[in-house]
């Protein structure tokens, strides 16, 4: 999926939209994402009044409620800086659906379109805007990937994680048999249709584990929560990790090295 990338020199400042699920269930992934950006020389700005992007209400058919939530976000990013989001689902909501929510209000639609053009999913920003080049500082490991439906079908960022992982010599990425299938989370779908969601999550967990990987990676907190929850119910030790945390750890983030595999 083609989109306009920032022209001119590398951005020096970005906004960070954490997402509800990262904030509440895997805050370490948010911190690791911020550290990945800061290590590249980026100043990260975190608007403290940010809330939900409105996606659960929107996909449940509550357009008015989603519009109210989205409207509250429009004024949080006044500078013309990129907005980096560690979730394909939330990034997809902000980029593709915010302008639709305000289609009948020219002023708000213009603000939504301006914001939408600046929204980047984390791996997209690292790869396509910052053009990061990393060295691996971890032990050999095998992983498999789960990409969210929004990353694949809305954002077109489903291959970016693979490209980033390909820079890491000690990481082997194994292909799963249900690569393009949903994990069953789907915002409120997992609550409204728990039996169907549970069956989908079970199939996905099976496909990921059957690869023989040491762990699975995903760039979406909802998918991680759903699949890891299924594995937890089974008392299975196989687990998933957010892509941001894995990249931070593998490129020396927790070992006192810079991103080039050298002592800082």
Predicted regions and their residues:
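Iron-sulfur cluster-binding electron-transfer modules in prokaryotic oxidoreductases
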Residues: 1-264
């Amino acid at each position: 999926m083609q989109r306009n990338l920032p022209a001119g020199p590398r951005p020096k400042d970005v906004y960070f939209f954490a997402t509800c699920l990262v904030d509440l269930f895997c805050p370490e992934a948010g911190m690791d994402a911020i550290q990945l950006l800061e290590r590249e020389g980026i100043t990260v700005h975190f608007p403290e009044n940010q809330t939900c992007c409105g996606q659960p209400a929107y996909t449940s058919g509550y357009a008015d409620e989603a519009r109210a939530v989205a409207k509250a976000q429009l004024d949080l990013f006044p500078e013309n800086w990129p907005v980096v989001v560690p979730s394909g689902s939330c990034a997809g909501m902000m980029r593709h659906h915010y302008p639709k929510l305000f289609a009948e209000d020219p002023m708000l639609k213009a603000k939504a379109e301006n914001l939408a053009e600046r929204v980047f999913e984390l791996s997209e920003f690292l790869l396509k805007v910052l053009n990061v080049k990393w060295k691996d500082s971890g032990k050999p490991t095998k992983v498999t990937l789960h990409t969210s439906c929004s990353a694949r079908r809305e954002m077109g960022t489903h291959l970016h994680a693979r490209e980033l992982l390909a820079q890491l010599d000690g990481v082997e990425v194994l292909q799963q048999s249900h690569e393009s299938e949903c994990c069953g989370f789907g915002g409120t779908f997992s609550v409204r249709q728990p039996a169907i969601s549970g069956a989908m999550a079970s199939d996905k967990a099976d496909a990921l584990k059957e690869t023989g990987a040491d762990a699975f990676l995903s760039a979406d907190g909802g998918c991680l929560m759903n699949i890891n929850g299924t594995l937890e119910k089974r008392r299975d030790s196989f687990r998933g990790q957010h892509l941001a945390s894995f990249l931070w750890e593998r490129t020396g983030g927790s070992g006192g090295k810079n991103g080039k595999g050298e002592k800082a």
